[in-house]
């Protein structure tokens, strides 16, 4: 099978970690008789340096023409003072919007080999952590109208948080369908005791839940969710929520596993086109030092195979290869402890690729 992948290596450690994912994908091609064609596009700070914008129109067109997009990371202190309209992160919002990527899937799974790396007590993580946060990506306060006015001599800033019924319904369907493939439970997170947008969210979710009688459904307020993720994360299967709540909760959930470097994510459209990236940032402090953990990016590539290319066997092979590397005691610096074998970013990629 031939597939075209647009590669956005980005800034900081982005090029290093993406190179390891491609190393693994190349082995998949050899083992399963596929052909992946890679097209590189500058994004973020490196694009600002070259072209004055975080992504060019030509680069965006290449993303839209691809079968899937693989992203490293964007941003860094170097670009903190550029105009807000051309900040590196603006490219991500633009790609999500242009590609219609409305659903962000962030699995949080504690690798048993790393259970002692979790900041939670063994009595909590002993029950296992295997949850999926489904976050709405193209609506809410991040895409609402915003303005700064002067009222009675002082500045007043306003951000609008807007959701329509169809936006809530389509992200809800992603969550319910995901739950059917997992443990069959959906928790919808909102702030319906305060926000009108959350009351609409809850009403639409209740109606949608009637179409999925085989899925156990519950409502939970966002502040209680933040607490329950620490108190008893094993209670959750699929969590679905709006853009800002999902942004915050998914970062909280990522640390339950002990390292943000392990976690992948997928941003999906209504077609098979998606963008796949690790959840961590560009880590400019270790860029170019071969110290980054490529596992989150490699697992993101596995999600790409599963969700965009319908290559479940190939995705399983990557996940088994990652588990074997951990079983064999290999650790990058962020997850290293005495008694294990410390390896660099490139070597970890090579080890995982060789396990396929």
List where the protein language model places each region.
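Glycine-rich phosphate/diphosphate-binding loop of Rossmann-like nucleotide-binding domains
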Residues: 6-23, 27-29, 151-223, 235
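Glycine-rich phosphate/nucleotide-binding loop
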Residues: 45-48, 230-330
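Buried hydrophobic positions in well-ordered alpha/beta secondary-structure cores of metabolic enzymes
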Residues: 11-14, 67, 134, 175, ...
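Short acidic loop-to-helix transition motifs that present clustered carboxylates
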Residues: 113, 220-227
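N-terminal beta-loop-helix "entrance" segment that forms/cooperates
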Residues: 33-57, 227-229
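N-terminal glycine-rich phosphate/adenylate-binding segment common to multiple enzyme folds
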Residues: 49-158, 244
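Generic N-terminal amphipathic, Lys/Arg-enriched alpha-helix
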Residues: 1-12, 39-41, 332-336
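Glycine-rich phosphate/pyrophosphate-binding loop and the adjoining helix
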Residues: 138-139, 143-182, 186-188, 192-194, ...
């Amino acid at each position: 099978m031939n597939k075209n992948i647009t590669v956005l290596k980005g800034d900081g450690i982005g090029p290093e970690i993406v190179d390891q994912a491609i190393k693994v994908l190349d082995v998949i091609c050899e083992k399963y008789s596929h052909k992946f064609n890679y097209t590189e596009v500058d994004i973020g700070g490196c694009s600002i340096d070259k072209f004055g914008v975080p992504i060019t129109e030509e680069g965006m067109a290449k993303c839209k023409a691809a079968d899937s997009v693989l992203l490293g990371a964007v941003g860094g202190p170097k670009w903190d003072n550029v105009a807000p309209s051309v900040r590196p992160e603006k490219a991500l919002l633009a790609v999500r919007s242009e590609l219609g990527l409305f659903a962000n899937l962030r699995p949080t799974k504690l690798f048993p080999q790393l259970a002692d790396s979790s900041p939670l007590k063994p009595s909590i993580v002993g029950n296992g952590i295997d949850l999926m946060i489904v976050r709405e990506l193209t609506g809410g306060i991040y895409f609402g109208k915003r303005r700064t006015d002067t009222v009675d001599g002082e500045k007043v800033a306003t951000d609008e948080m807007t959701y329509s019924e169809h936006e809530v319904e389509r992200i809800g369907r992603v969550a319910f369908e995901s739950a059917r493939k997992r443990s069959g439970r959906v928790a919808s997170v909102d702030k319906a005791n305060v926000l009108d947008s959350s009351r609409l969210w809850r009403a639409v979710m209740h109606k949608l839940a009637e179409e999925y009688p085989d899925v156990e459904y519950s409502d939970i307020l966002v502040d209680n969710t933040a607490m329950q993720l620490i108190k008893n994360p094993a209670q959750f299967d699929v969590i679905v929520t709006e853009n800002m709540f999902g942004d915050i909760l998914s970062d909280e959930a990522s640390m339950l596993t002990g390292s943000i470097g392990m976690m992948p994510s997928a941003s999906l459209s209504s077609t098979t086109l998606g963008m796949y990236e690790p959840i961590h940032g560009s880590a400019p402090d270790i860029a170019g030092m071969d110290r980054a953990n490529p596992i989150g990016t490699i697992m993101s590539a596995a999600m790409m195979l599963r969700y965009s290319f319908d290559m479940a066997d190939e995705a399983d092979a990557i996940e088994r290869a990652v588990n074997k590397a951990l079983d064999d005691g290999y650790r990058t610096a962020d997850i290293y402890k005495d008694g294990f074998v410390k390896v660099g970013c490139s070597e970890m990629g090579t080890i995982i690729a060789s396990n396929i």
